[in-house]
Each structure stands twice: as C-alpha cells, then as structure tokens.
Amino acid sequence: MVKRSDKVGEQIHKIISELLIKGLKDPRIGFLTITGVKMTPDLRQATVYFTVHGSDEDKKNSEAGLNSAKGYIRKEIGQALKMRFVPEVLFKYDTSLDYGQHIESILKEIGATDDGEQS
C-alpha cells in the first residue's frame, strides 16, 4: 500500500523538476538534479534533495538560488496540487552520491592492492 506522503512527494518532485527546466531563471542555479523528495507524515514539510554537477562553489550557489526561489516554488506547488496546506519546502544537498563515489574509490584501492599482492 502506497502512502499518501509518498504520492505527494512524487508529485512535488515532478513539479520542481519541470520548474527547473522551464521556470527558474536564477543564474546561480547550475546543472542540478532533484534526487528525491521526503514528506513529513502530516504533509506540512517537503525536504527536497538535490545534487549539483560541479565544484563546491557551484553547490553553494545553487543552494542559495533554490532557497531564494522557495516562495515561487511553493506557490507553483500549491497551484498544481490543490491541497489545503501547501508544504514548506526545504532544500538539502544529497551527499549519498558523493559517499558512493568515496566507497567506490576505496574499493578500487583495495582491488589494486590485492592485485599487487597476488603478483
């Protein structure tokens, strides 16, 4: 059984992704991807996870651009979803991809060490 919060999160993910393609013109927002949306059970808060392809400076600038567009994004969500309460939107950088790359590099190091020992 799918929870309502999951369905609403998927819809918000779709709306924000479309806004990034069509609606947001902030030059600080770089090439970013919305990786997920987590809703609170009462549907009052949506935490939007994103990744940025670029440097740490690009990450900071993109987060600042997203935070400055919160009001516009929330208004668009409200118009699209027709909910009694429009959830507050919080943006968080998704560190899971960075962590995955870190683990992958460690595994490659271990593999290179094992290959050296076997020779």
UniProtKB/Swiss-Prot annotation:
Transmembrane segments: none annotated. One of its GO terms (biological process) is maturation of SSU-rRNA. Its main location: cytoplasm. SUPFAM superfamilies: Ribosome-binding factor A, RbfA. It is found in: Cytoplasm. GO terms for cellular component: cytosol. Keywords: Cytoplasm, Ribosome biogenesis. The keyword Signal does not apply. Pfam families: RBFA. The keyword Coiled coil does not apply. It comes from the Bacteria. PANTHER family: RIBOSOME-BINDING FACTOR A, CHLOROPLASTIC-RELATED (PTHR33515:SF1). Belongs to the RbfA family. NCBIfam families: PRK13815.1, rbfA. This is Ribosome-binding factor A. It comes from Citrifermentans bemidjiense (strain ATCC BAA-1014 / DSM 16622 / JCM 12645 / Bem) (Geobacter bemidjiensis).
